Structure formats: structure tokens, C-alpha cells
């Protein structure tokens, strides 16, 4: 794996000179190998090691190289044709393979090859981009989008119209991460490498990027780029220092543990008790 990483790094440094017609066959094979490993979940752009998320930038470089190496081709769809560099993940699946991987894919759901979809996952008409990792038991609801290299944990619910931001460039940026057992409410957007920690509940219409203030009303603490584990979050605003205006913020209204989540429904958790 280390030798593969070094070859990808070297090819990326020379990317300005790489085109579909000039690329060396060995580089093409290395990049295709990485895409295949991402597709199978054998590697992932980010993984949690000793409680901390680590980003494997060389895998992102391989994904970016793929856009320089592979040319556009015609891709057959059920009701139309497409013209793109990245094939569709399920293009060669048959009934036996869908059953073996325990994936349910509703018509018009689009998943690009190089993204991993775990067992017992349901994909409503949605979009999962290249390099993404969607773990077991997750629901990607209608018109939800999982961006490039985003990491979605086990037993997550991405409600209708949710946007999970992608991140290929800038290269140093970390991917957006939704940890296990989270619920993301309809039309919410989590972007720019924000991490929503395990067991959190995000209400409908909450927008969180790196500059969004995430205010804990119980402690007065303000977080950036991270929703603490077990948070229940709604959209709101905070007053300016001068008191003349207010600006948007995400508000942590309460904290819940796994035991409470098991006993109480999502709708109940989102009811604010002053």
C-alpha cells in the first residue's frame, strides 16, 4: 500500500502533463486500482483511529487524477444517456449481487463508481458522489446528496433534500463527516468538513459550515466545525455584541445519550422545552 501511495503522490505532482492520451499505463492502472478499492470499502478517504479522524490525502489525489486520466464516455441510464468520466456504481450489478450486498436502490438514485455503500442501506432517489463512504444501515432519503469523499456512519438517516458537502479541493480540507446513529433533518446542509459526532440529531433546515457558530444554550460554549456527540440542534440566531442585529447560528438545545434515544422518538427529541 505504501508503494502505491508513493506512486500516486508522484503522479499527482506531474498532473499538469497528464491527459487521457498521454498517461502512462501504469499510472492509469494505479488510479483505477484506488477507485476500485474505494468502491469496495477496502480503503476510505477518512477513518477514525484512536478516537480521532485522519484524512488520507493521497486517496483524494487519486480521485482527482482520475478526472485527468479517464475520458468522457456514453453511460446508459434507464430513461436517458449520460456523458461523463466516472461510470455508475451499479451498472454491472445483477439481482444476485444486490441481494448479496443487501442494498436497496430506488429508481433514479445515482451512485458513482468509487463510492462505498454498506449493507442494509436504502437509497431513495438521491445522489452519492465519488469517494464517499456510506456505512451499514443508513437511509439516504429522496433528493439527499452525499458529496465527494463525505463519510456517513452506521444507522444514519439523511432526510429528504439533505446536502452533505463534498471535498476534493482544496486538497488539504477534511471531508464532511456524519458519525454513527445521527439523524439529519430535511433540507439541512452540513458542509466544509464539519463533523457531526455520534448520536446527534439535526433538526429540519439547519445549515452548518466551518464559520457557523454552534451555540450550546446549556453551557454558553460556542463550537466551530464540530457538533458534539449527542447534541440536538435547531436553527436560530445570536445577538451581535452591539445589540443592533443578530446573525444565524445553530443552537444545541439539549443533549441526549443512547439510552434516551432508544426510548424517545426523534420528533420528541426535537420538541424544545424552555
From Swiss-Prot:
Q: Where in the cell is it found?
A: Cytoplasm
Keyword terms, alphabetized: Acyltransferase, Amino-acid biosynthesis, Cytoplasm, Diaminopimelate biosynthesis, Lysine biosynthesis, Repeat, Transferase
Which GO terms of the cellular component aspect does the record hold? cytoplasm
Tell me where it mainly resides: cytoplasm
Q: Which gene encodes it?
A: dapD
Instruction: Please name the source species.
Output: Shewanella baltica (strain OS155 / ATCC BAA-1091)
The family database entries (InterPro entries) matched by this protein are listed as:
DapD_Trfase_Hexpep_rpt_fam, Hexapep, Hexapep_transf_CS, THP_succinylTrfase_dom1, THP_succinylTrfase_N_sf, Trimer_LpxA-like_sf
The protein, known as: 2,3,4,5-tetrahydropyridine-2,6-dicarboxylate N-succinyltransferase
Pathway the protein acts in: Amino-acid biosynthesis; L-lysine biosynthesis via DAP pathway; LL-2,6-diaminopimelate from (S)-tetrahydrodipicolinate (succinylase route): step 1/3
Amino acid at each position: 500500500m505504501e508503494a502505491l501511495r508513493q506512486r500516486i503522490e508522484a503522479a499527482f505532482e506531474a498532473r499538469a502533463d497528464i491527459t487521457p492520451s498521454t498517461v502512462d499505463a501504469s499510472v492509469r492502472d494505479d488510479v483505477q486500482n484506488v477507485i476500485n478499492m474505494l468502491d469496495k470499502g477496502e480503503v476510505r478517504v477518512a477513518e477514525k483511529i484512536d478516537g480521532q479522524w485522519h484524512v488520507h490525502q493521497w486517496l483524494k489525489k487519486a480521485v482527482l487524477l482520475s478526472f485527468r486520466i479517464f475520458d468522457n464516455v456514453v453511460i446508459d441510464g434507464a430513461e436517458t444517456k449520460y456523458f461523463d468520466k466516472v461510470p455508475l456504481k451499479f451498472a454491472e450489478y445483477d439481482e444476485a449481487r444486490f441481494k448479496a450486498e443487501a442494498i436497496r436502490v430506488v429508481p433514479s438514485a445515482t451512485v458513482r463508481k468509487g463510492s462505498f455503500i454498506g449493507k442494509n442501506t436504502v437509497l431513495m432517489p438521491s445522489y452519492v458522489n465519488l469517494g464517499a463512504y456510506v456505512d451499514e444501515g443508513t437511509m439516504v432519503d429522496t433528493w439527499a446528496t452525499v458529496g465527494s469523499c463525505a463519510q456517513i456512519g452506521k444507522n444514519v438517516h439523511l432526510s429528504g433534500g439533505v446536502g452533505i458537502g463534498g471535498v476534493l479541493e482544496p486538497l488539504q480540507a477534511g471531508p464532511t463527516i456524519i458519525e454513527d446513529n445521527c439523524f439529519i433533518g430535511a433540507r439541512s446542509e452540513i458542509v466544509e468538513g464539519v463533523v457531526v459526532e455520534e448520536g446527534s440529531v439535526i433538526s429540519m433546515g439547519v445549515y452548518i459550515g466551518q464559520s457557523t457558530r454552534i451555540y450550546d444554550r446549556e453551557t454558553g460554549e460556542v463550537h466551530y466545525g464540530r457538533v458534539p456527540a449527542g447534541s440536538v440542534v435547531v436553527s436560530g440566531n445570536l445577538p451581535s455584541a452591539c445589540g443592533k442585529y443578530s446573525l444565524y447560528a445553530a443552537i444545541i438545545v439539549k443533549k441526549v445519550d443512547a439510552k434516551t434515544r432508544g426510548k424517545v422518538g426523534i420528533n420528541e427529541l426535537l420538541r424544545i422545552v424552555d
